[in-house]
Amino acid sequence: MSYLVCHFEKYKSANVFGIQKHNQRENENYSNNDVDKVRTPLNYDLINKDNINYLGKIKGLIEANRASQRAVRKDAVVYCECIISSDGGFFENLSISKQKAFFEESLNYIKNKVGEKNIISATVHLDETTPHMHLGFVPLIENSLSAKKLINRQFLKEVQDQLPNVLKNKGFDIERGTEGSKTKHKETKEFKVKLEKDVKRLEKQLDDLTNKAVSYTHLT
């Protein structure tokens, strides 16, 4: 029996660029040994045809849909991401087209939960150990930016209860994880650890480049 992996994370502006680089495979020398570069061209985004500027799209959505004219706090959560997957055996029993349908149905459900206009990207990675989707969105609710209001305990319970049933009704043999269980899916933990490492590494690279630019400016 296969269980649905559906894990939400919240991010501030400082983390978004690193997530963009990870999701869109913009690193020439990728440090993640689980990434098979030969299969990277098989990755796809269900929202965007080409790579995008995450922060630019996020800023545009906030400006267009947020009622308040006050500046967004630097420590505000501006981007949320949902990782959707299952175990390797689940995907091995699906054709490529059925795998895509699995992610499309999951995307459609999340669109209804967070608002289609708030979706940034839905990147499916097929070049790692297990197929999975990084579904990113701006936490806008009632014309305000608030991840706390949107992604609360009730929201998470509804997703965990409803999404597996939606997928089962579409013909996918998948179940909800055990309610109240302290055991977390290995895949989710691995995704989170790898992503956090990539974000920290990219932030260090940005700091190094900034310091070099400042040094060069002082010399000229």
Which residues make up each language-model segment?
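N-terminal nicking endonuclease/strand-transfer module with a His-rich metal-binding environment
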Residues: M1-L219
